[in-house]
Amino acid sequence: MNKIIHIILISIISLTVISCAKKSDSSSTTSSGLFVAVGYSGTLLTSSDGTSWTSRTSGSSENLWNSYYGNSTFVTVGNKGTILTSSDGITWTSRTSGTTEHLYGITYENSTFVVVGDNSSGSGTILTSADGITWTSRTSASSNSLWDVNYGNNTFVLSDGAGGIQSSSDGISWTSRVGIDTYGIWGGAYGNSKFVVASTYGYIFTSSDGTSWNNVISRSASALNDVVYENSTFVAVGVNGTIQTSSDGTSWTLKNTGVTTQFNGITYGNSIWVIVGVSGNIHTSDGETLTSRTSGTTVPLNRVIYKE
């Protein structure tokens, strides 16, 4: 099952109520870090400050869904088994994944990259790699399409398109856990000693161990596409400009963004929040003001990450 397009991600801002402003860049902070945003039609953008963005050649025309930095390597995944790697985020190389399934989620911990994806073959796709170059297929404990994967408390946790959860200590052998929703879970994060995941119908669940889960929000106003834990704050983003924040993952505050666009992904770095979404939209925030940035593209952007 193909991943539902842009259910708008979860994230941004952790402090005060956000106001919306559109302005040109007047100043930026020099940083050795790098933001990488990925999207449709092989789109790859980079920025050192989150405000000025440069298009990079991915070598792929497939939709790119997610990216992660680990083991001194950027790894980006996408449709039809696409896996791209880069040492600097600028120059990218296509790798052989061994699958033609669409790949949606990726993480890196315990010296292991874990990638998850579609299920047209009858089982959700799980791939692992030590270096991002050579990949091995693993057996999923579910036939559902797999959407996201995270790591915390010595445990990998993945979520699927039917509200299912699986966990693993090594990323290789997986155990199915009780389904926590009937809707797809598109985004998740680990922080403050707990996992937090959000569904396409706006439900938010938490767990300390990846096995037992609590429903902390029955349903928010909008579908949520992404959740991160950065700057000591959980942030979830989604459709209709939705941004929700929480310090503990349990009590959430809906921010007034003044924006109606769909947000798909969010990250924090260089003392700034960066949010990406449909139509090439990129917004940044210092925690108080949400500012529209020029991306140079009109295609949907799915995720954004920051490497220090």
Where are the predicted features?
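Residue-level hotspots at or immediately adjacent to binding/recognition sites across diverse folds
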Residues: 25-308
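Bacterial Sec-dependent N-terminal signal peptides
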Residues: 2-4, 13-34
